[in-house]
Amino acid sequence: MSNTSNTSETHRTSDAPCQTTKAIHGASIASPQPSRKHQRSLFTLHPLRAWWRNRSLVDVHGWRVSVIAKLPDSSVAMPPPMLAAIAALNLPWKVRDPNTGIVFLLCPPGKCTIGSSSDEDGHKDDETLIACNIKHPFYLAETTTTQEQWERIAGANPSVHVGPKLPVENVSVNDCIAFTRACGPGFRFPHEVEWEYACRAGSDTPFSHAKHLDADIVNYNGRHPYRDGPPGPDRLHTVAAGSMPANSWGFHEMHGNIWEWCVAAATRVALASADGDASVATVMRGGSWANHAHNCRSASRLTRASDYSRKTAGFRLARGI
């Protein structure tokens, strides 16, 4: 069933999400140059730490990391084909970047269908079903970037809801570009195909874990549940990154809590290979604490201007291999 309400009716106007410009190639994204006009002076960049002196670190294609787990353990409900695909890469599954403190999980190449069918409640015209091919492995952060991690690199904290373990928010695309560059070479936004691939974790339902949202395990506006799902609390703020249960691939809060900036292809057709024009819009994925359930679907996407920032807008780091 098509969504009968517009965006302004289904998420709070003051907290709406954005659009920007980015360059991409394959599933690897080259961050665009931020506009000087819109760039905020958030950063007092901290010098990179001398992590190369730590001999306990492991080299992953030129990226020095500490290995947390070589393969997923029984605490992650990962299907056997995914486990086999990760093992075949001969790369550590769970690693920590010593400079930022951010934990990353390995995603192997694979295929997935993104978007939603026309009869999915909340479906929009820009959610056409597309069969996609993830050509290269990549690492994606286990959670959205926290304020503690942001301050470690950037110094200043722009967030409205303040707490070291809470996701950093109220950040624009330009702010996030500056942050990724300060983290070092190779860090970037995830492509929206990569994001949805990791969010769905092999599922084809509106949400990675079910056909409905449970407000006890997803932070969204529980007064507006999905279809005939049960209502729940409206927490009115973010919760700590990693505090909600992970999906079957180990990623936390892919639904709700905070919208996540991602890079989009220039057209829906270009999404099939995660490839597209050098001038593309940046989208937000996942929904937030302020949104109705249908805005938190795996397929849901919103675009805004690159200087847009709100207390519902954050991001999750990625790194190519």
Locations of regions flagged by a protein language model:
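A short glycine-rich, aromatic-capped structural motif
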Residues: W93-S159, V171-N174, G256, V263, ...
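Functional-site microenvironments in short loops/helix caps that host divalent-cation chemistry
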Residues: T113, S117-D121, S159-V162, P167-L302, ...
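Compositionally biased, intrinsically disordered low-complexity segments enriched
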Residues: S2-S14
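Short, structured beta-strand segments at or near domain termini in extracellular proteins/domains
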Residues: K311-I321
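Residues embedded in well-ordered beta-strands
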Residues: L105, Y139, P206, E260, ...
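N-terminal pre-domain segments of enzymes
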Residues: G26, S41-L89, W93
